[in-house]
Amino acid sequence: MLTLARQQQRQNIRWLLCLSVLMLLALLLSLCAGELWILPGDWFSPRGELFVWQIRLPRTLAVLLVGAALAISGAVMQALFENPLAEPGLLGVSNGAGVGLIAAVLLGQGQLPNWALGLCAIAGALIITLILLRFARRHLSTSRLLLAGVALGIICSALMTWAIYFSTSVDLRQLMYWMMGGFGGVDWRQSWLMLALIPVLLWICCQSRPMNMLALGEISARQLGLPLWFWRNVLVAATGWMVGVSVALAGAIGFIGLVIPHILRLCGLTDHRVLLPGCALAGASALLLADIVARLALAAAELPIGVVTATLGAPVFIWLLLKAGR
């Protein structure tokens, strides 16, 4: 038994090391890649200081943090709702953040500062997450809870479309592209949003014990002495914060929170002591690679990263649905 535990521990360490190496390689490639490729040897040249340190580095850090936040949010929501298909985009949390953002632009007539827009996006994400948690407490079946989340997402998407379609505001027209997901406008001015993600990410990665209890189910967690009300509300707040900040940084990006935790579980990373940091590393790597594809796919323009993640993630999602139905 002890030998099996040690083997599992070594395997977990190997997975985390491999994911760390993958993330570092993706980070280096992201700094090099672009319309003008700049190799590491030229990073400290005048051209490198402009393109790498002023343009690509803040974007790369934002992609890394958002990818980690979305993947961890997916893992947390799947444990919270006891639903393997739960994730921020599918359950409408990302769209809720978008509604909060667009409402702020409308009510503020485009005059609100960036920090206020970010807070409104966080508030929108929190509201949708709390509604979903209310549904979960009514002991809805997995399929009904999933449908409730999809319905909330459709309502939020419709509200955003109505607001954008009837608005004459240039800001809202630009938001229509932005809500498809993209890091094109990220620079060092958004560093406060990046910093707002770091403490919550680190804190959640350290909460493996309550997360493991929640993953056992509500009854088992209560029998083990976990204060469910406290942890549910704290994790809802943390998830809403991460999703809201991510939407404020890059718009709505789907499937990262769904696919990454599932793939890691299939690889044997079921313990949240390993799953949470693994999700952070794998989510960051996946979104970095998707961002590179979005930048390089077209010569004269940049694809919305949400399109890239949806194209890659939708087939995996269909496969997971088919597997769950067997």
UniProtKB/Swiss-Prot annotation:
Gene Ontology biological process terms from the UniProt entry: cobalamin transport
- Cross-referenced Pfam families: FecCD
- GO function term, MF aspect, one: vitamin transmembrane transporter activity
- Classify the main location: membrane
Entry keywords, A to Z = Cell inner membrane, Cell membrane, Membrane, Transmembrane, Transmembrane helix, Transport
How is it placed in the membrane, per its record? Multi-pass membrane protein
Q: What's in the GO CC field?
A: plasma membrane
Transmembrane portions of the chain: 19-39, 61-81, 88-108, 112-132, 146-166, 184-204, 240-260, 274-294, 302-322
Q: Which Gene3D superfamilies match?
A: ABC transporter involved in vitamin B12 uptake, BtuC
The record's subcellular location field reads: Cell inner membrane
Q: Which residues form a coiled coil?
A: none
- Which InterPro entries does this entry report, sorted A to Z? ABC_BtuC-like, ABC_transptr_BtuC, ABC_transptr_permease_BtuC
Q: Which family does it belong to?
A: Belongs to the binding-protein-dependent transport system permease family. FecCD subfamily.
Q: Which NCBIfam families match?
A: PRK03784.1
Q: What does this protein do?
A: Part of the ABC transporter complex BtuCDF involved in vitamin B12 import. Involved in the translocation of the substrate across the membrane.
Assembly, per entry: The complex is composed of two ATP-binding proteins (BtuD), two transmembrane proteins (BtuC) and a solute-binding protein (BtuF).
Q: What is this protein called?
A: Vitamin B12 import system permease protein BtuC
Q: Its gene?
A: btuC
